[in-house]
């Protein structure tokens, strides 16, 4: 049986925008984790009785999500800066608020990440995450596409992102958080339908859908149009001979706390990193 949707209450933070969402979802995740593919799928399976859909993309933490979103999508169409177009979704839409490279706040933070809103204004908090090896390979590939980033810049971004990736995995143990593993989501229709049930959403369209062009689409397959065309579980294999990628993996392998967090969800990744643990990085002879 499908779980009941936690409809937001009148007088909530949404009221100032004339909204009383049927379902309001917060979605967190690192870039290159499949966030937008998952969000598009959620939007194609809105809560029963929804009058439309609103997607507030890449919002700024601790600010009003409507004011701080980087882009807006209403009823499946990008609306840019046209905030007034949210009215096209009706008064009881499904709303998704996304945060990139950001973990849900600690329960002891004392305030909601959405300024002007309360915990009751959110039906579910979701974290989209991806296997460490595939995620890190995809991120480095994406960074390579920026001509202004030299190797030191890429290395700095990689290491800071790896640190934040570990924090996000830790938040998956937080009560009330729904984790969506992109690797499993891509490969298993039953995994997807079970998640919809957990979120109180009907199964309307359980397909992977088209490639989303937020963030430039796939790092590896720019020509791919459909999610089923992607080999998302083999990214690390395509990068395993890349020296820059191996340097990032070597540094990550020396962090026992990170490895513990990764092993909880991706033990095969940690097994593959095992030879790097405590190894010499390769400059000169090991003492």
Task: Locate predicted features.
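PAPS-dependent sulfotransferase catalytic domain
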Residues: 90, 95, 99-205, 219-233
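Residue-level marker of structural boundaries
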Residues: 47, 144-145, 282
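PAPS-dependent sulfotransferases, especially Golgi type II membrane carbohydrate sulfotransferases
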Residues: 1-21, 201-287
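Generic detection of long, well-ordered alpha-helical segments
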Residues: 32, 155-159, 189, 252, ...
């Amino acid at each position: 049986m499908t779980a009941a949707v936690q409809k937001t209450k009148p007088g909530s933070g949404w009221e100032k925008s004339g909204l009383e969402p049927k379902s309001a979802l917060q979605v967190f995740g690192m870039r290159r984790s499949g966030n937008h593919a998952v969000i598009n799928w959620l939007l194609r399976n809105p809560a029963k009785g929804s009058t439309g859909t609103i997607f507030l993309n890449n919002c700024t933490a601790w600010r009003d999500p409507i004011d701080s979103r980087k882009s807006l999508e209403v009823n499946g169409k990008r609306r840019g800066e046209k905030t007034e177009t949210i009215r096209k979704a009706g008064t009881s839409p499904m709303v998704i608020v996304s945060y990139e490279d950001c973990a849900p706040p600690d329960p002891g933070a004392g305030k909601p990440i959405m300024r002007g809103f309360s915990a009751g204004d959110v039906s579910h908090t979701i974290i989209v995450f991806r296997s460490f090896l595939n995620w890190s390979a995809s991120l480095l590939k994406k960074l390579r596409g920026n001509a202004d980033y030299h190797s030191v810049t890429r290395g700095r971004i990689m290491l800071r992102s790896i640190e934040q990736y570990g924090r996000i995995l830790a938040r998956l143990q937080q009560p009330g958080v729904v984790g969506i593993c992109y690797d499993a989501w891509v490969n298993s229709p039953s995994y997807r339908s079970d998640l919809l049930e957990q979120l109180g959403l009907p199964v309307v369209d359980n397909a992977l859908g088209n490639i989303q062009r937020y963030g430039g689409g796939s790092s590896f397959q720019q020509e791919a149009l459909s999610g089923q065309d992607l080999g998302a579980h083999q990214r690390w294999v395509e990068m395993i001979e890349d020296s820059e990628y191996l340097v990032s993996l070597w540094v990550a392998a020396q962090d026992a706390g990170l490895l513990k967090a990764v092993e909880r969800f991706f033990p095969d990744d940690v097994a593959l990193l095992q030879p790097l643990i405590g190894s010499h990085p390769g400059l000169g002879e090991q003492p």
